[in-house]
């Protein structure tokens, strides 16, 4: 990731902003994703928080919920219909006469949808219920073939049977705790989660999930 073909390439050959600020109080990760992708504030792009209250049904639902879309590989229905502003990926599509390829992938549906914008070829997320890569019928072509292959050939059990602990002795790190610590004090095992949903939720909070996406 940190080699010549990783982040260094993005910094040296891409567009890189080392110091970017938005003058608002964060309403959650979805609000932040929308602000970063549109370059504007929540008052303009409409994503004010992770959830909103639907008065008709009296339910609290995800901000990207779309009753007209159907989940593919997921029971969740999501699309960018509630995003009022264009993202830079939308502008990229327009400026290249739709020749650019735009795919977004994230650990949860709302972030994937907002990162992709309105014109993405596909937004992909890791579904908590199924443990599979999923998308929405909003994207006409559905899941890319490599996602289908991964869902068929790859068992998430191989990654969710994780043990998360320090790679080296704690005292060798730059900022060790002032308290007497050991690797045992920072040890997380997936085996304690018997429920698959809880297991995947815990997995999403580890570096192994970042490696997956």
Residue ranges and their predicted role:
Residues 2-45, 101-105:
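Short, structured active-site-proximal loop/turn typified by the sulfatase FGly-forming signature C/S-X-P-X-R
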Residues 41, 49-213:
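His/Asp/Glu-rich, glycine-adjacent segments
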